[in-house]
């Protein structure tokens, strides 16, 4: 029997650089035996012994010639289903894809650019996958989507660990704290940095792992000496890791974490949270509207703290470190959440229901230069707006991190 064909268009397939690539690989692992999968990726991923056909295409080249290249690939491959995982050019040409193809886009973030390109041209898309209830609400409001079945909430999943050793973690004398957000504004890096500085002023024993980028905004500017987190955090023996590691090493660290710290301002549905929870841990998240709130219940399977409060982080960490016995139930509850709500069986079931749905788009049309021009213009206004917002965030981070260093010296 001939397998149906899925074309997965992704902004990244090269692991180690973020959740979108991880999502793509997990997607392929789940569907590769049931479907014939083709990949189009924006990055320079190099296959290593894979039997999956992979195309490379610049998703940010909005020329009509590049759009035609993508349409030619679609015409030659003749997929039954196309998944758009943050592939910007595909969002723009959605109105020109053949009507018989089911088109599903994935919104990897609760709002902002990743959500914009998932909902762009929504009337020509059959379904949109949101990773959270907050993300679904944002898409409905932003793109005025009235159809109740247009957007489906399908949480990420994580393969379970055969023998998570919770008991050894509970019995540790020195607890491991892991923050996996690098210097990201969305992960509240500056708030976490300030909290760590306060925590390091105590004599409490712990091990800290800061995973991800350590270069702060303005780090390449030759007129400043404050270039990375290393210039702000002291040389303290309790800091065990500062900087990026491979995905495999990150998974090992997350598996062994006691306290998982990710008080994000915005999220889709963080894979790192699931990677930590499947080993049993105490997750700490913020009360900002993002996907983590869909699965974390305060003091049951995690801790929820006020957003933008470094003192709340410090107080919570100190309380856990000093009164660890009062929190050990969270280890098993977080693991149970993964095993009962976020496993591959549930994800597969929801995805297959989505794939069996009838096509749900208005009639698509032929590509013309004038129609394409106006769609590109609209997309570029999104990107310009995002660029301005991002520069403001970068300026805030530039000032805040240097303020922290100034406070240390004075």
Describe the function of each predicted region:
Residues 222-245:
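Nucleotide-activated donor-binding/catalytic signature segment of Leloir-type glycosyltransferases, i.e.
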Residues 7-9, 129, 169-187, 193-196, ...:
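Conserved donor-binding/catalytic core segment of Leloir-type glycosyltransferases
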Residues 244-245, 252-257:
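Short alpha-helical donor nucleotide-sugar binding micro-motif in glycosyltransferases
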Residues 282-286:
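Short hydrophobic beta-strand element within catalytic cores of glycosyltransferases
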Residues 265:
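Aromatic "clamp/platform" in nucleotide-sugar-dependent glycosyltransferases that forms part
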Residues 325-374:
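A charged, aromatic-enriched C-terminal amphipathic alpha-helix characteristic of glycosyltransferases
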Residues 84-90:
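Short His-centered aromatic/hydrophobic patch
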């Amino acid at each position: 029997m001939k397998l149906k064909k899925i074309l997965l268009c992704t902004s990244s397939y090269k692991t180690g650089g973020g959740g979108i690539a991880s999502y793509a690989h997990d997607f392929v692992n789940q569907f590769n035996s049931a479907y014939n999968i083709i990949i189009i990726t924006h990055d320079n991923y190099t296959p290593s012994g894979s039997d999956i056909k992979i195309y490379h295409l610049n998703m940010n080249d909005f020329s009509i010639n590049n759009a035609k290249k993508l349409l030619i690939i679609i015409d030659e491959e003749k997929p039954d289903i196309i998944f758009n995982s943050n592939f910007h050019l595909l969002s723009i040409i959605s109105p020109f894809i053949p009507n018989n193809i089911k088109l599903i886009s994935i919104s990897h973030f609760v709002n902002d650019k990743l959500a914009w390109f998932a909902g762009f041209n929504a009337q020509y898309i059959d379904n949109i996958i949101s990773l959270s209830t907050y993300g679904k609400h944002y898409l409905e409001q932003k793109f005025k989507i009235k159809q109740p079945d247009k957007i489906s909430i399908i949480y990420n999943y994580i393969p379970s660990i055969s023998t998570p050793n919770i008991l050894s973690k509970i019995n540790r004398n020195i607890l491991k704290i892991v923050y996996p957000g690098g210097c990201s504004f969305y992960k509240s890096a500056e708030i976490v940095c300030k909290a760590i500085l306060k925590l390091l002023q105590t004599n409490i024993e712990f091990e800290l792992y800061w995973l991800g980028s350590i270069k702060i905004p303005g780090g390449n500017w030759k007129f400043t000496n404050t270039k990375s987190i290393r210039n702000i955090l002291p040389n303290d023996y309790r800091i065990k890791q500062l900087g990026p590691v491979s995905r495999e090493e990150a998974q090992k660290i997350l598996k062994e974490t006691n306290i998982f710290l990710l008080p994000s301002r915005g999220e889709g549905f963080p894979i790192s949270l699931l990677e930590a929870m499947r080993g049993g841990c105490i997750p700490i998240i913020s009360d900002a509207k993002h996907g983590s709130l869909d699965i974390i219940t305060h003091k049951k399977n995690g801790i929820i703290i006020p957003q933008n409060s470094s003192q709340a982080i410090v107080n919570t960490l100190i309380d856990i470190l000093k009164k660890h016995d009062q929190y050990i139930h969270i280890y098993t509850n977080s693991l149970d959440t993964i095993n009962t709500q976020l496993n591959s069986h549930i994800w597969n079931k929801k995805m297959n229901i989505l794939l069996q749905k009838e096509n749900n788009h208005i009639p698509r049309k032929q590509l013309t230069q004038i129609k394409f021009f106006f769609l590109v213009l609209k997309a570029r206004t999104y990107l310009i707006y995002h660029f301005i917002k991002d520069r403001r965030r970068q300026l805030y981070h530039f000032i805040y991190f240097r303020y922290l260093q100034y406070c240390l010296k004075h």
